């Protein structure tokens, strides 16, 4: 019973890590895409530039996916080995270790999408502003990367 609860918690950790980051990416891409759609009705030649700005918040979803794989890998579930060592306490540790990726992905994805939407308006006024719009939106990416780093350090300490 103890091992079963721990394994369920590890799977929950993987799901929560991924889904939170997926939500952040989806909402962020929605915000940027909504702004881009308005611009593209008037200036369809800006499609490739708008696509770049809309895609930026998608990276948080990738981080969430990687985080889920890391949790399943570090716990030994992907390898299919002996899982009897995954206690309830260990399961909780994996769940906590995934939260930095999930929460950083959720919030940074949403805020990056909001900034990217503003960047869409910058580019609509002057195409030369694309680089500036990308840099400003990419600054928010830093926090998602820090979330990945913290989760990785926690996972290494659990498995070690």
Regions of interest found by a model, annotated:
Residues 1-160:
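Hydrophobic, small-residue-rich transmembrane alpha-helices and their short perimembrane loops
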